[in-house]
C-alpha cells in the first residue's frame, strides 16, 4: 500500500446534488421542487408551528402558570467545595468568584458531602443540619445576615 493508491471505501463518498443545471441531469428546470405551489417559490415555506390553517397545537393548549421574577435561585455547595476555597470567611460573592455558584444564584445552601478540616465562617449562607454540625465541629460557624 502506498499513499498514492489509497482510495475511500466504496459508497462512502456521495456527490453533491447540483440542481437547476439542465434537463439531462434529472434535477434541471424545477430543481426537484415540482410545479407551482408555496414550496416551489423562493422564500415560500411555512413558519415553525404553522399547521396549514388548522389551529396550531400551541394555541389549542391552555396557558399554564407563570414565571416569577422574584424567585430565589438556590445553589448547593458541598463541604469539599468549602475546603477547596480555603478561606477563613466565605459568603455568596466569594463562592461566585471561585466558580461554585452561578450568576443567577442568589442564595446558597451547604450540604454535607465530604469533610471539612478548617474553621470557616459562613456569612448569609444556610446549611443542612448535618453540614452545620460538621462546620461547627471543625471550629467554624454560620452567621445569619439581618
Swiss-Prot record:
GO terms for cellular component: cytosolic large ribosomal subunit. The keyword RNA-binding applies. InterPro entries: Ribosomal_uL15 (IPR030878), Ribosomal_uL15/eL18 (IPR021131), Ribosomal_uL15/eL18_sf (IPR036227), Ribosomal_uL15_bac-type (IPR005749). Pfam families: Ribosomal_L27A. One of its GO terms (biological process) is translation. Keywords: Ribonucleoprotein, Ribosomal protein, RNA-binding, rRNA-binding. Residues 21-31 have a biased composition (Gly residues). It comes from the Bacteria. GO terms for molecular function: rRNA binding; structural constituent of ribosome. Residues 1-51 are annotated as: Disordered. Part of the 50S ribosomal subunit. Binds to the 23S rRNA. Belongs to the universal ribosomal protein uL15 family. This is Large ribosomal subunit protein uL15. It comes from Polynucleobacter necessarius subsp. necessarius (strain STIR1). The gene is rplO.
Amino acid at each position: 500500500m502506498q499513499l498514492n493508491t489509497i482510495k475511500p471505501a466504496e459508497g462512502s463518498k456521495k456527490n453533491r446534488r447540483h440542481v437547476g443545471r439542465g434537463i439531462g441531469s434529472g434535477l434541471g428546470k424545477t430543481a426537484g421542487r415540482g410545479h407551482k405551489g408555496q414550496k416551489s417559490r423562493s422564500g415560500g415555506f411555512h413558519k415553525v408551528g404553522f399547521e396549514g390553517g388548522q389551529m396550531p397545537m400551541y394555541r389549542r393548549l391552555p396557558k399554564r402558570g407563570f414565571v416569577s421574577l422574584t424567585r430565589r435561585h438556590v445553589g448547593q455547595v458541598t463541604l469539599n467545595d468549602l475546603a477547596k476555597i480555603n478561606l477563613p470567611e466565605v459568603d455568596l460573592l466569594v463562592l461566585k468568584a471561585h466558580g461554585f455558584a452561578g450568576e443567577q444564584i442568589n442564595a446558597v445552601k451547604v450540604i454535607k458531602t465530604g469533610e471539612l478540616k478548617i474553621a470557616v465562617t459562613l456569612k448569609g449562607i444556610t446549611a443542612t443540619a448535618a453540614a452545620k454540625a460538621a462546620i461547627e465541629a471543625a471550629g467554624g460557624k454560620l452567621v445569619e445576615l439581618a
